[in-house]
Amino acid sequence: MAYVIGIDIGTSALKTLVVNKSGDVVESYSVSYNTAHPKSGYSEIDPEIWYEATLESLKYILNHYTHNDLTGISFSGQMHGLVVIDQEGNPIRPAILWNDTRTSQEVEDIKKNLGLNSLLQLTQNTVLEGFTLPKLMWLKNHEQDNYKRIYKFMLPKDYIVYKLTGNVYTEPSDAAGTIMFSVKDENWSTELLHRLNIDPSICPEIIASHQKSGQLTEKVKNTLGIDSNINVYQGGANNACGALGSGITDEQKQLVSIGTSGVALSIENSTDYENDGNVHYFNHCVPNQKYIMGVTLSAGYSLEWLKQLISADENFTTFLKDINQSEVGANGLMYTPYLLGERTPHNDASVRGSFIGLDANTTQLDMKRAVIEGITYSINESIHIMKNNAININEIVSIGGGAKNNQWLQIQADIFNTTITTRTEEQGPAYGAAMIAAMGEQWFNTFNEMSEAWIAYHQKVYPIETNTKSYQDLFNIYKTIYD
């Protein structure tokens, strides 16, 4: 029996899956770790922690499966992080993560130096504090000695691939999130690099997500106690892998993922599409596919915040049990989920959240429902941008915490006015990484073929017409609050 391994390098944990040729997850393993916050707004980690977590996971898997049966490994990784290595291949400093916000001045400088229109033309995206380019410019401005030592920069998953194989690559889905990459040309923007005086040689070579990066080095094999070769494939960005693992391989379905943040994602392959900066426009890990993505920064984070305020000891199932006792519209209460600012469509780091319509009759159930509705309204702003771009949205695959509560699934169907589908067995981005490894191993001819064979769906939730009409009016009110 042959197996592939998918590994997701998350912010707080590394998750590993073993998948057989039928697409069944036969083993999983997780390793948790902590990030460092040495100053306000800073978020860092020693990249060797990811590598040690990877080795621990592989040792666990190898204790349960014959290494000759494990034929391929691939990765999903958190986007936008900056890892820099020197000529000897050693990390120069801790990795700066996606949720690090120290780069506000660099963002303004980049916009001033390039101009927003030029930036959109060169990369098809705007620049934000969490992205890789301003982190690199921050190093240039604040740690000049470290900047001068840079041999290559990498994204988090690419560093692990490098440690396992000795080869430095990245691929389009992660490169797009650096804002140094032309999404349409699928290569580094040499003009942008030149205008910002960044040496192009520090950029890793681009290969396809399912292209072979190499094999485990002899040093790694000795550490793991094996002698067989295992192929390593480059992998993809976490959102791309999450979409792939949910069956989003073409324009037929869209994705909504509600975790700490919320994501709405749709394939967008029109050659005429021009991003105005309100959404992200990135390359998929599926060849020749691109997607647009809107982000709600405080999705599940908002619900966790409310739970800690009013019922910290309850689990989420109990916390949300009776929210249908509050009517559509939460009895006149509305919530804006701007606890950490907002991404789509406002790109506003300073705006803050609010409850509107509180009165003496407001109940805890009203507050719970208002928060869920507010999160879903925010994601619906991204859905509306997609609809305005002539994307035909007939079915949305919902994953994450928002898919684990039937009442919230109904609210999604009603607010989005679209059929909501859930996965039979949701495994997150690590499953998409395993699919990339399987494609690299040539188990299938296309990702569509693999998706049809491997991806199963659990239930469909349909919009209720009377609820949808009410939510359309409420959503129009919601959109006026920011203005």
From Swiss-Prot:
SUPFAM superfamilies: Actin-like ATPase domain (SSF53067). Keywords: ATP-binding, Carbohydrate metabolism, Kinase, Nucleotide-binding, Transferase, Xylose metabolism. It catalyses: D-xylulose + ATP = D-xylulose 5-phosphate + ADP + H(+). The record marks 8 as: Important for activity. GO terms for biological process: D-xylose metabolic process; xylulose catabolic process. Pfam families: FGGY_C, FGGY_N. The keyword Kinase applies. Its EC number is 2.7.1.17. It comes from the Bacteria. Substrate binds at residues 79-80. One of its GO terms (molecular function) is D-xylulokinase activity. Belongs to the FGGY kinase family. NCBIfam families: XylB. Catalyzes the phosphorylation of D-xylulose to D-xylulose 5-phosphate. This is Xylulose kinase. The gene is xylB.
